[in-house]
Curated annotation (Swiss-Prot):
Protein name: Tryptophan synthase alpha chain
Keyword Lyase: yes
Gene Ontology cellular-component terms listed: cytosol
InterPro entries according to UniProt: Aldolase_TIM, RibuloseP-bd_barrel, Trp_synthase_suA
Keywords for the protein's UniProt record, in alphabetical order: Amino-acid biosynthesis, Aromatic amino acid biosynthesis, Lyase, Tryptophan biosynthesis
EC number(s) per entry: 4.2.1.20
Reaction equations catalysed: (1S,2R)-1-C-(indol-3-yl)glycerol 3-phosphate + L-serine = D-glyceraldehyde 3-phosphate + L-tryptophan + H2O
CDD domains per record: Tryptophan_synthase_alpha (cd04724)
Amino acid sequence: MNRIDEKFEQLRKRNEKALVGFVTAGDPDPGRSLEIIRTMCRSGVDILELGIPFSDPTADGPVIQRSSTRALKAGMNLSKAFEMIRELRGTCDVPIVAFSYYNPILAYGGAKFYRDALDSGADGVLIVDLPPEESDELTRQWPDRDLALIRLVAPTTPPDRMSAIAQSASGFIYLVSMTGVTGGGEPDLTELSFLTSELRSRCDGIPVCVGFGISLPEHARAVSPLADGVVVGTAFERIIEAHQNDSAVASKVGEAVGALKAAL
């Protein structure tokens, strides 16, 4: 059982839902990024999604796209992101999921990625643009599968495909609440209720976390009864973007984390 499984077990015992917080590694620069993440851990984030900056993040909206641009300009890459995780592990025991597009992993090398991710202290990986049927070439290089493989389910995913995705997932399943890119509008709770019910009937107990369109405490409060957790990213990156030259940027992100966690 890795840290992700342990976290969900702890939350279930406390009748709590998970706050999964996304930030881009190295935004606005590596030093302040570390400070922001440490503050998020202290402020109540249950699982950290650490975005690996990429030059063409097609699933992300403009806010997270700009965060990738800032991080890349500051020199962040996959190897340095692993160094960041390793450094975080000295003070932060929160489960960490490396959130990446496939291209950086392909360039890095699948076996090396797996080894370095585990060595750094990462607990899982979410590859946003790699569907299960195309992932065998990569995952066969991961002999022990000690790294949780988070899978995405979209509103357009047919029920039989949900079952296939769930069979290949571990850690949790990320349910995308709406079509489009990150940072869009609010989720339709009626449709989301149907989606979560359909997915839960097919995922054999794997936790389900809902993301896209959740930026305020009231969004998190409304969605939390339907899932095991919520994923928030754009809201944090908006704060980082607005206060990137402010020494209080980490504390402002921490305040947002605290408010969202309190709503769950």
